[in-house]
């Protein structure tokens, strides 16, 4: 299986990498949050752009991205607009979503973009090609904050992302029971052992699914999300606790 290298970080080998999400409404809070995050122990900075108020002003968005890049130049920067339909803060049209991601790619400020699988097949394929032409990696994602589908469906979605040439397929699902967590873990393992030729990220959300955020190295998830301050999704634990547990499991 091939790994994915972003800056000096190799994703897909060793302990799962820690991603943290920065959620800020304006330039001033981007700046203050960035300074606070700089002291934390994590591997990838995700900027959740859907929390940013001045979205229609592309110059303002890119000015904020520049602050993040300059404050943490060594950290891979993942640009993510999470749509309202997948649990994000704002709803925008598909055209605006694609344009925003293309602007991020064009800026040269971001290392990775998050691209939602169910944006539309043609738009997804074109945006992946555009990102790769500009040396930007793509995390292709799907989120369900209500339920966990059958393992076959989870695997089918991850394989579709892989077929669309995502660098890293990602799926996050809400469990309604502990057995749903086992379904997610079993699907992750089957994907990793039988189909994946690149790193994948999977997680079961909420308190019920916390084990999935810790056991990635066992079942085949290459990264996990932790919280510096406020969790960006239910079930995230603090980066310090997360690093401790990931290290224990890695060294066991």
Swiss-Prot record:
Alphabetic keyword roster: Amino-acid biosynthesis, Aromatic amino acid biosynthesis, Lyase, Schiff base
Oligomeric and partner information: Homodimer.
Annotated disulfide bonds: none
GO CC, one annotated term: cytosol
Residues binding 3-dehydroquinate: 21, 46-48, 82, 213, 232, 236
CDD domains xref list: DHQase_I (cd00502)
Protein name: 3-dehydroquinate dehydratase
Listed EC numbers: 4.2.1.10
């Amino acid at each position: 299986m091939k790994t994915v290298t972003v800056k000096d970080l190799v994703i897909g080998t060793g302990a799962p990498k820690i991603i943290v999400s920065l959620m800020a409404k304006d330039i001033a809070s981007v700046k203050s949050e960035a300074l606070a995050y700089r002291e934390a122990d994590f591997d990838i900075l995700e900027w959740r752009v859907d929390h940013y108020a001045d979205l229609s002003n592309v110059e303002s968005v890119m000015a904020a991205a520049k602050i993040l890049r300059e404050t943490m130049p060594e950290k891979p920067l993942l640009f993510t607009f999470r749509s309202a339909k997948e649990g994000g803060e704002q709803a925008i049209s598909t055209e605006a979503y694609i344009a925003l991601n293309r602007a991020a790619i064009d800026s040269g400020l971001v290392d990775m973009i998050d691209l939602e699988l169910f944006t539309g097949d043609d738009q997804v394929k074109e945006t992946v090609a555009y990102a790769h032409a500009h040396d930007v990696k793509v995390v292709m994602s799907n989120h369900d904050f209500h339920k966990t589908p059958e393992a076959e469906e989870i695997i089918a979605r991850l394989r579709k992302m892989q077929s669309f040439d995502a660098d890293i397929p990602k799926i996050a699902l809400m469990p309604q029971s502990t057995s749903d967590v086992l379904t997610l873990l079993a699907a992750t393992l089957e994907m990793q052992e039988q189909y994946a030729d690149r790193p994948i990220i999977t997680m079961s959300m909420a308190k019920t699914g916390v084990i999935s955020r810790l056991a990635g190295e066992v079942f085949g998830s290459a990264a996990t999300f932790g919280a510096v301050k406020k969790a960006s999704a239910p079930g995230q634990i603090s980066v310090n606790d997360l690093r401790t547990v990931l290290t224990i499991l890695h060294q066991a």
